[in-house]
């Protein structure tokens, strides 16, 4: 009887020790937050950015949920924008920085961040911005480490 009780006690302790480890690995979810308005991006471009961010989170094997403990949010800034004249049509060029932050909601601590430069071209600034957002590759090695 004494052996059975100690055996059950050891099994119970092992279950308590193993379960939190597996639930932490499987239960991670990150919410994606994109501002409703931006100085640089219009509503359609913000939707495109949100889709890219959700793809980045999903590509990492983490679920993208709106009610998550962690949030991923972007800071998008245009560093340089120019219009190259010549030929039959002018070409707009945009060099921008996209910084992604993962923040813990309960204490606002930044857990991780990554910054990358994106470039785009088009017949106007709007098309160049869309091209810059399209150049973000969710499955790239930069995001695998992020």
Task: Label each residue range with its predicted role.
Residues 29, 95-97, 115-117:
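Ser/Thr- (and often Asn-) enriched beta-sheet segments in non-cytosolic proteins
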